[in-house]
Swiss-Prot record:
Source organism of the structure: Geobacillus sp. (strain WCH70)
Top-level taxon in the UniProt lineage: Bacteria
Signal peptide: none
Record-linked Pfam families: YpsA (PF06908)
Protein name: UPF0398 protein GWCH70_1907
UniProt record similarity statement: Belongs to the UPF0398 family.
Listed Gene3D superfamilies: 3.40.50.450
Amino acid sequence: MRVLAITGYKPYELNIFSNNHPAVSYIQLAIRRRLLSLLEEGLEWIVISGQLGVELWAAEIAYDLREEYPQLQVAILTPFLNQEERWNEMNREYYEWIVSQADFVDSITKRPYESPAQFRWKNEWIVRKSDGLLIVYDEEKEGTPKYMLEVAKRKENYAIFPITFSDLQAIIEEAQINETQIDNRFDF
C-alpha cells in the first residue's frame, strides 16, 4: 500500500472541544500504531481532507513519524477553497500549522463552498486516488465518517483499517495498566 486516506470523527462528534483533551492522545496512539505497521510495508503518502478532528490529529502523528520514516508524505485535499474560513481563530491557527508542513495541498473542486455535493465529490476522489482507508469510526455511533466509509466499501480491492471504540478502550486500559505498573515501582 502506497497511499492511505485517513478520516474519522470531527471533534464535536466525540464531545472533544480542545486538542489537549485526554482522548486525543489515545486516538493518536491508535493511529500511530496503524501507521507504523503500514510504513513497514511501504506506505509513502497519507491523504486527508483537512477537516478538524481525526484528520488533523493524524497529520500531527505523520509529521512526528517523518523523523524515522522520511519517505512519509502528507497530502491535504480540501473539498473546497477556504474551508477554514468560518472556524474560530484557534482552530484556524491549528489548521494553518498543519497545512504549513504538508507536502501537497490543493482543493478538489477549486471553488468556494457551493453545496454539500462537494463533500461527496471529496470522498469519491480521495477513495479513488488511494489504496486504503484508515478510519476512526464505530458503526454503533453514526457520524460524518460514514459517508467516506460507504464510498470505500464500494471500491474493489480497497483495504479498510477501522479503529473502533473497542480498539480505543483497549488502548486506554493498556495505558492505565502501564501507568499503574510504573507507579508501583516507586511504592515503598
